[in-house]
UniProtKB/Swiss-Prot annotation:
Domain of life: Viruses
Protein name: Kelch repeat and BTB domain-containing protein 1
Gene transcribed to yield this protein: KBTB1
Keyword flag Coiled coil: no
UniProt lineage: Viruses, Varidnaviria, Bamfordvirae, Nucleocytoviricota, Pokkesviricetes
Keywords in alphabetical order: Host cytoplasm, Host-virus interaction, Kelch repeat, Modulation of host E3 ubiquitin ligases by virus, Modulation of host ubiquitin pathway by virus, Repeat, Ubl conjugation pathway
Amino acid sequence: MNNSSELIAAINGFRNSGRFCDINIVINDERINAHRLILSGASEYFSILFSSDFIDSNEYEVNLSHLDYQSVNDLIDYIYGIPLSLTNDSVKYILSTADFLQIGSAITECENYILKNLCSRNCIDFYIYADKYNNKKIETASFNTILRNILRLINDENFKYLTEESMIKILSDDMLNIKNEDFAPLILIKWLESTQQPCTVELLRCLRISLLSPQVIKSLYSHRLVSSIYECITFLNNIAFLDESFPRYNSIELISIGISNSRDKISINCYNRKKNTWEMISSRGYRCSFAVAVMDNIIYMMGGYDQSPYRSSKVIAYNTCTNSWIYDIPELKYPRSNCGGVVDDEYIYCIGGIRDQDSSLISDIDRWKPSKPYWQTYAKMREPKCDMGVAMLNGLIYVIGGVVKGGTCTDTLESLSEDGWMMHRRLPIKMSNMSTIVHAGKIYISGGYTNSSIVNEISNLVLSYNPIYDEWTKLSSLNIPRINPALWSVHNKLYVGGISDDVQTNTSETYDKEKDCWTLDNGHVLPYNYIMYKCEPIKHKYPLEKIQYTNDFLKCLESFIGS
């Protein structure tokens, strides 16, 4: 006999005929014949049981009445070479029995079956099971499935069996698959209603309160399972004092604006989190050296060069909600390039740059209010400049560094308010062409050029400016020097990507605040040779935001699921 399967079949034949059997597994009134040696070889539990003082060597029976007979019988058949026949109903019993008997291969087979068949119809059931039996692999997989399908599950009959501890974990998770934070209170209310359990402050703390619409906050106030709890009403009365919340991963789209790898058009790319890739969603004719500003989910591109050798005064825009281009926007007062763009609650600002007629530097700051027919001059910088960093923070326009007369960099930092210009602490080094972002109450800049004379040295510097203390802090440098990179912030993390050169254009980096270091980010790799001008997190908008509050607003909100 030279085949192990034939050997196993022969031994199973001995068991079926009772030959050489030396142990009986007793479960209530049922008995299962077996061989100690075979059971010990497959099960750590039986190996310890039969090789210790737990059972006398002459003892012929082992009582396992606390276990499920069918599961034990199936597992002993499995030990003797008969494949497991698994179903969604049986696999939990067999897995917990295999775990008790410590049959490793059966455990793996059951886990693989569950992972393969995990879906929205069974994820809650498997999550509750895995939590009970402390199976972290199944618990993690089923929990992630719950997060992905949460809006489908709120009407599932098993939804009410989730514990408050589980709901706190679900509602707190950044990966909760909702495209608008208003759906989080809906999830909470549906669970409260299905369990008839009163709300707690711990549950309310899981909501990103600062991101909720007034209509949903009113709905929380008025719901009987919330309003009847004094502590909950007290919490809601003090939400104005809560810190600003970060959006969940799926409530925003990461949109990049740049020049396509063929370098013949502007490309709008969207980051696909499932595939960890950037996908082009739209494009138009070539343009470069333009300013970018984002207002109400519309990306505005101002000035720059098109396919002619002349600078442009045109302003075009891309609406991320309708996935369409907008061309009927008033032109700038005159053609310009290498300018900066920022927005406040009402206006879009175009700052500085280079004029088309004589390539002279510009000091003008022009602004436009959407729906108005023209741009108007708002102010003038103290010194004409281009390729500077610009930022809007606490209602002030900050202008950082840039290229001034003579083609040299400057180290100035100044802010503009209704009262005029104010000088601040200078940069540690003269810089231009850097990326700029406001993050956690500070201004961050990265990359660009650094030189006190001719602009020619590519930088990997990263600096942060604290407006409260009027001070600059040098952070860990980028791994790769970058010119005009895109700098963006998502979920309290900083990222930088792209470069306006032919080298390493498809790399991005992420900043670890605790370790003060930048690491190459494999999750946001750009298309090859794609020049990223700007990257913006775009918050999803829903028609419900325009709906007036009513007593059944949450039901109205539920009708938008899937839209």
